[in-house]
């Protein structure tokens, strides 16, 4: 099954269909993948962008989704709206995550039911940053993590992929 999209801020792609398995890579919100095999609580997937294969939990995906913007900050805090106020949550989306904007105001984009991001943290999906050094500098002092793709930890291949 092609054209599925990951719908959590970040997830591990495990080598085996168990939570404590070795990680082959990570998958970001809005990232497209193909389902290769269905197990009880797991899908074996192949990411469309970089071709990594492994297992993710079954409930972490959307079938219908068209990213129109992407996160262009190391991590972008998710806000909830209560009345006219925007309240910080403890959750983030990470650099490169794709979102579909469903509502907006002066300072925020809504991308899911009562989930908002600051406009300044996102750019059009087709935006291409010409300054490679600018992107690399975002990751100064970020620890190395096998398979990592975020500010929580990154590996060598992800550092290059994030630019492209």
Residue ranges and their predicted role:
Residues 1-2, 25, 29-34, 39-40, ...:
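Boundary regions of SH3-family modules and the immediately adjacent low-complexity/disordered segments
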Residues 5-7, 15-23, 32:
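Extended, low-hydrophobicity, Ser/Thr/Pro/Gly-biased non-transmembrane segments
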Residues 136, 150-164:
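Active-site nucleophilic cysteine motif
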Residues 143-150:
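Second-shell loop/turn segments in exported
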């Amino acid at each position: 099954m092609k054209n599925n999209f990951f719908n959590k801020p970040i997830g591990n792609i495990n080598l085996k269909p168990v939570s404590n398995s070795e990680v082959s890579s990570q998958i970001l919100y809005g990232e497209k993948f193909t389902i290769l095999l269905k197990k009880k609580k797991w899908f074996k997937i192949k990411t469309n962008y970089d071709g990594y294969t492994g297992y993710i939990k079954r409930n972490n995906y959307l079938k219908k989704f068209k990213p129109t913007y992407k996160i262009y900050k190391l991590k972008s805090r998710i806000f909830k709206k209560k009345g006219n106020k925007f309240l910080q949550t403890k959750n983030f989306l990470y650099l490169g995550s794709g979102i579909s904007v469903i509502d907006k105001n002066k300072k925020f984009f809504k991308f899911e039911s009562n989930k908002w991001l600051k406009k300044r943290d996102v750019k059009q999906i087709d935006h291409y940053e010409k300054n490679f050094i600018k992107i690399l500098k975002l990751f100064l002092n970020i620890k190395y993590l096998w398979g990592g793709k975020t500010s929580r930890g990154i590996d060598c291949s992800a550092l290059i992929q994030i630019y492209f």
